[in-house]
Design a protein with these regions (language model features):
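Hydrophobic beta-strand-centered segment that forms part of the acyl-chain substrate-binding groove
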Residues: 2-4, 70-106, 132-136, 140
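Active-site helix/loop of acyl-thioester processing domains in fatty-acid/polyketide metabolism
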Residues: 26, 57-80
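Flexible glycine-rich active-site/ligand-binding loops centered on an Asp-His dyad
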Residues: 57, 125-142
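Catalytic strand-loop segment that frames the active site of acyl-thioester-processing enzymes
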Residues: 18-57
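Hydrophobic beta-sheet segments that form the core/acyl-binding groove
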Residues: 26, 91-128
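Intrinsic-disorder/low-complexity, polar/charged segments enriched in Ser/Thr/Lys/Arg/Asp/Glu/Gln
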Residues: 21, 31-35, 104-106, 120, ...
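Beta-strand-rich interaction surfaces with strong enrichment in secreted/lumenal proteins
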Residues: 11, 53, 95-97
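Short aromatic-glycine motifs in intrinsically disordered, low-complexity regions
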Residues: 7-17
Length: 142
């Protein structure tokens, strides 16, 4: 398992493509933990309507960035090569602060349990060392 991954290497693992790829780089990867980055720019398509004159990243896309980062971790594992990651559920999601254009999301995901092909993960997103969102995620693969 490679420690750092570029966007190209992420594209080899995930089926997501522009404009829906929401993780730009992997900074660190261990057996059950990963740290990813999403650089949020004013050019993101969702800022056109969310909200005009006061752009804020939609919370559901922050959750999707968490899920994609967790997906990179799952699909870096040999036993999951060639499968498609699916987001199976979410619990305890909270948004603490808004995310604006120019923010750099640091996305931390830890897989805490794998049972019969379903993984449970804890995820946190930070901007400038401030917690902006967290959730528990469920993953599976087909």
């Amino acid at each position: 398992m490679k420690q750092e991954l570029s966007t190209g290497e992420i594209l080899d693992l995930l089926p997501h493509r522009y404009p829906f790829l929401l993780v730009d780089r992997i900074l660190e990867q261990k057996e059950n933990k990963i740290i990813g980055v999403k650089n949020v720019t004013i050019n993101e398509p969702f800022f056109q309507g969310h909200f005009p004159g006061h752009p804020v990243m939609p919370g559901v896309l922050i959750l999707e960035a968490m899920a994609q980062t967790g997906g990179v971790l799952m699909f870096s594992k040999e036993e999951n090569k060639g499968k498609i990651p699916l987001f199976a559920g979410i619990d305890k999601a909270r948004f603490k602060k808004p995310v604006y254009p120019g923010d750099r999301l640091i996305i931390k995901v830890e897989i805490v349990r794998m049972v019969k092909g379903i993984g449970k993960a804890k995820a946190e997103v930070y901007v400038d060392d401030n917690l902006v969102a967290y959730a528990e995620l469920l993953f599976t693969a087909v």
